[in-house]
Amino acid sequence: MHSAMSFLLLFSLCFLIHCFVFLLIKKKKAKTMDAKTVPPGPKKLPIIGNLHQLGKLPHRSLRCLSNEYGPLMLMQLGSVPALVVSSADTAREVFKRHDLAFSGRPAFYVAKKLTYDYSDITLAPYGEYWREVKKILVLELLSAKKVQSFEAIRDEEVARMVNFIARSSNPVNLSRLALSLSNNVICRIAFGKISGYEDGSEAKSKFEDIFHETEDFFGTVNIADFFPALSWINKFNGVETRLKENFKKLDSFLNQVIEEHLDSRRSKTEKEDIVDALLRIQGNPNETITLSSENIKGILVTVLLGGSDTSTAVLVWTMAELMRNPMVRRKAQQEVREIIKGQGKVGESDLSRLEYLKLIIKESLRLHPPGPLLIPRETIECCTIEGYKIPAKTRVFINAAAIATDSKVWENPYAFKPERFMDKTVDFKGEDFEMLPFGAGRRGCPGMNFAVPLIGLALANLLLQFDWKLPEGMIAEDLEMEEAPGITVHKKIPLCLVASPNRCAAQD
């Protein structure tokens, strides 16, 4: 009891000292900064600044605040200054004129451990290592040719999902199936076949648990991310212990994967998987970068999390919107079934002919960007945006959700209307700033070309092979569209639907 009270007193004293120092520094900075040179923003509370205004779904809270304070807004999140960009014009200035200044990444407590000290591509600091690893990803791992080489894997896994639905009793949990599809595809592409990790095996089940736990860690807010000086609290609140346990299991699995790929007795598959490619690069003395085993594992964490999460979220949100908009769904089914008539299934080579399906995917990415705030950036140098001075080490949030629902750009922005793209050349590849589901510039998502083919292939086959209904007693207006908090925003309530086989497709 005495030791507990002593710890509480010590904690309180340390916290008060930190608060006092923070206020002194803040006051000193305020005196030297002309208020007219910084962007507008909401009033701050002592110590926490504007943290209380983030809410459970920050992209929504920040959109409301930007409506009041403007598309370029400065906030104070704990001890961290944060800039929020909420319009296409402001995003264009950031990415076109100041992309280098905005190319940094903030330090995150959990990410440092789970990415092997930022050995990944997503959160690595801007610099030589990041440039070389991005080059590897773009040229070796995620090039158009490489993505195309994995077409058979995507085709097989989509067929397995379709067969599972056909055998299942209704309703089917499409959220769970989409996650399983994405996980299976990314694991086969990244690792090939790992002994002992067959479907239904205990080892695979444990890996999936590790994978989901790792995702949860990345999506959880940590006090150290807003008060870096208080990172020591994680030693006492259980976070560091749980983080170490998760990392130990993740590291053990990745070590097994690498060791098996290095085993000379391992049978070689027809296609080089991502681990094979990274080990080949590691062993090439002519490469400009020498990859360590830790670097390889950090890159694999990026590939695993980014590749699976995005595809799952987009596929589920798209199907949910189709269920809420039956006329759109019927039009999409009609297109798929007319064009694919006689084939029995949709192949990737068919996707280019499915024009309406492309519009549906665009509209889904506009209305439900998988990462609505993108991955936060950090300024690496001072710059001026729209006449406002932005200091170095400012955290930057690009509110892709707000940009893509801006009523000044989009008519009836919250309606799901694929037809809006019939007379618009706007795309999602980072060149058009009216919608930025994959970001833009140097730090744009390199895995975009990896996710989109799987989403299109899965969606087209679901529409070809089945007629879809909501569970008995539900109508379109009853379908919940609430978002779950996280870096990637998933549908909070699983999407459960009734699937009836399309007999014409089965006969084909």
UniProtKB/Swiss-Prot annotation:
Pfam families cross-referenced by the UniProt entry: p450
GO terms, molecular function: heme binding; iron ion binding; monooxygenase activity; oxidoreductase activity, acting on paired donors, with incorporation or reduction of molecular oxygen
Chain residues that bind heme: 445
Residues annotated as transmembrane: 5-25
Catalytic reactions on record: beta-colubrine + reduced [NADPH--hemoprotein reductase] + O2 = 11-demethylbrucine + oxidized [NADPH--hemoprotein reductase] + H2O + H(+)
Assigned EC number: 1.14.14.190
Topological category with respect to the lipid bilayer: Single-pass membrane protein
Keywords: Heme, Iron, Membrane, Metal-binding, Monooxygenase, Oxidoreductase, Transmembrane, Transmembrane helix
EC class name: oxidoreductase
Pathways per UniProt: Alkaloid biosynthesis
Disulfide bridge partners, by residue number: none
Keyword Transit peptide on entry: no
Sequence similarity: Belongs to the cytochrome P450 family.
Protein name per Swiss-Prot or TrEMBL: Strychnine-11-hydroxylase
